[in-house]
Amino acid sequence: MPVQHRTIVVGNTSTLKSPVGIVRILEVIFACVTFSLVVHTGRWGGRIGDLCMFCWCFCFAVTLVILIVEFAGVQNRMPVSWKNFPITFAMYGVLMCLSATVIYPLQYLEDKAYNSEARNYQIVAIVFSCLTTLAYIIEVSLTRAKPGEVTGYMATTPGLLKVLETFIACIIFVFISDPAQYERHDAMKWCLAVYCICFILSIVVIILCVGECTGWLPCAFNKFLSGYALLAVLMYASAMIVWPIFAFDRKHGGTPSRPSYCRSGQGNLYRVCDWDKLVAVAVLTAVNLIAYIMDLVHSARLIFITV
């Protein structure tokens, strides 16, 4: 009687036992616990709640996919650069979970009308959201490029700054479009053009790196990065000057101080009004300007790039 051999397929368990693999497992667990607790409380209705839920669920799903791909050892079959994609997503994971961790309690935890048990679940969910954010921060610190190391561009400081720049731009779009603050003056429309152009170019850089398409550029990649960073610094510097003038100067129809109707709102300790959004755009413009300046400095010093 012939001997039958059974083939046992064993995945790459070493990736799960590595420090990065362990951190990713914790990210999946923490994110799952977070959105499960929030769903249990039922306190996540509305656009802000949907946004927070999307952040936790999206991070959970993509991290789980990354774990499965690395466990199966099929990174080379994926249509993306595996030297760039995981670190890019990890950085987005930091920013998304951090935003949800800050926004959710401000919107839903202040309402004391709900019973203490529901609030306790919310507090625990916020704690696990903090842990999820911390786990992504650790992953970024473990996988980012070390001094002298030649790796994917997105693992370098300029690559991580690109992620930060696009995320901040997305937040600016939220504040500037509801209501359409830029329609107050043509100069503010210029600021909107600055945010859009720089956002699109940063996204293009990320897509080129993750998709391994940098060879499509008609010029050297490092020269393109330095030129774009310089252009972005100049454009954001102009927006940093123009936006506060036309948003807060009375001569141009602005409001220099917070209106009385913005003081408070029912059910919340703090109400975000249109004037607050103008301030938020000004602050985020300054933050992104600093990010682009750092990007320019690092891009000028970055000599060896492997995508």
Swiss-Prot record:
Localization of this protein: Membrane
Limits of the MARVEL domain: 15-148, 153-304
One CC-aspect GO term: membrane
TM helices/strands, residue ranges: 19-39, 54-74, 85-105, 123-143, 156-176, 190-210, 228-248, 278-298
Pfam families, sorted: MARVEL
Keywords associated with the record: Membrane, Repeat, Transmembrane, Transmembrane helix
Membrane topology according to the record: Multi-pass membrane protein
Origin superkingdom: Eukaryota
Family: Belongs to the MAL family.
Name of protein: Myeloid-associated differentiation marker homolog
Organism from which the protein derives: Xenopus tropicalis (Western clawed frog)
